[in-house]
Every structure is written in C-alpha cells, then in structure tokens.
C-alpha cells in the first residue's frame, strides 16, 4: 500500500475481524515488496534504476505523511494501519537504494513488521473482545487491571518503533545505511519517520495503558 493508493487499508483493517487484520498485515502487505525484490530488481534492473527517484519520493511521503496521520487517530486499528503504510515506505525505500544493506534491511523489515504488526492487532483484539470498542479514549489504566497484557503490549510497541535490540531497529538501521550511501537528503528526511514512529506508538501506549481507568 504505497502512498497515495493506501487509502483503502485503514478502513479494511477497521472492518476486518482480528484474524483478518493479522493476515492482511503479516502476509498480504508483503507481497508487493517481495515482487519488487524478486521480479523488478532481478528482471528489470535498468528500469528499477530509472524509477528510483519516483519510488524515493513516494516512500518518503509515505513515511512522513502517514506517520503524521497516525498521530491524529483515535481508533487503535487505524493507527496501526497507518503505521503499516509508514513501515512499508521504509521497505520500498530500502529496496530501491539498490544497495546490499538497503535490500537486506527491507527483507528484515518485512519479516519484522509482519510479526510485530500481527502481534499489535492481536493485542487490540484482546481488549476489543471485552470492551467492544477500538477507540483509544475508551481505555486507560490497563496496567492496573491486566499488567501482563501491558508488558506484552509494551514489548510489541517498542519493537514497532524500532528500539535498539529489537528486529524493527535492525531493519530500519540497515535501510537508512543503504539510503545514506545512495542519497543523503532522502535518508535524512526518512530518519524523521523514526522519530514520528516513536511518537505515535508511545502516545498510543501511554493513553491505553497509563491513562485514567
């Protein structure tokens, strides 16, 4: 789901049951990235190089723009959905750096995001089955009620924002290394997305887990 043809994704996640969101985030969203690596780079290397500036532009917009939209969301599933678009922006950016680090980082990022986003949708599904609401304002103070759940939620949120030591960090770090080698300006702009990613995930976690009960 690259920007600007990503608008179907948040609504699809909202309407889908938890299992559907898990499959969509963990498997289906990675098919385009696999196609780029398997077919575009392998069969059409010259065309891939020609279209690199366009993919860079779309990737950077996806990273920054959808991260800002995620910061404005009140629906937990929509927030995670927009974060998925931002993460896929990192994937396409890494692939089209045409650098070893960037491509390897994109592969790691796809695997990492598949696992972490699926886990985040499952954590949302756990509380949705009990409260029948996805709105962040509905929740608060969960740490005092279900502390073990809060710990798991924290681990998945930290992995999503790319904390050093998690799989999310490895993928994003390698992608940015490849980007810095190929285009310094694009890499600097994309780095802002790492900060925004931390902002919306910590904002989500704070309001759901440490807000007023």
Q: Whereabouts are the PLM-identified features?
A:
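A glycine-biased, small/acidic residue-tolerant capping/turn segment at secondary-structure junctions
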Residues: 211-213
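Hydrophobic transmembrane alpha-helices and their helix-loop junctions in integral membrane proteins
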Residues: 1-209
């Amino acid at each position: 789901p690259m920007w600007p043809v990503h608008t179907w994704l948040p609504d699809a996640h909202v309407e889908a049951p938890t299992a559907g969101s898990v499959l969509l985030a963990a498997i289906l969203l990675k098919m385009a990235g696999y196609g780029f690596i398997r077919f575009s780079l392998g069969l059409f290397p010259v065309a891939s190089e020609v279209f690199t500036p366009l993919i860079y532009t779309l990737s950077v917009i996806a990273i920054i723009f959808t991260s800002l939209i995620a910061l404005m969301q009140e629906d937990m599933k929509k927030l995670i959905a927009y974060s998925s678009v931002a993460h896929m922006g990192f994937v396409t950016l890494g692939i089209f750096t045409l650098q070893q680090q960037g491509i390897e980082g994109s592969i790691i990022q796809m695997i990492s995001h598949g696992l972490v986003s699926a886990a985040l949708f499952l954590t949302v599904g756990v509380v949705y089955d009990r409260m029948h609401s996805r709105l962040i304002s509905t929740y608060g103070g969960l740490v005092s009620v279900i502390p073990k759940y809060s710990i798991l939620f924290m681990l998945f949120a930290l992995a999503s924002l790319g904390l050093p030591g998690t799989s999310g960090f490895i993928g994003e770090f390698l992608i940015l290394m490849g980007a810095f080698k190929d285009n310094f300006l694009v890499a600097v702009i994309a780095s802002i997305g790492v900060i925004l990613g931390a902002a919306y995930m910590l904002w989500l976690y704070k309001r759901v887990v440490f807000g007023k009960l």
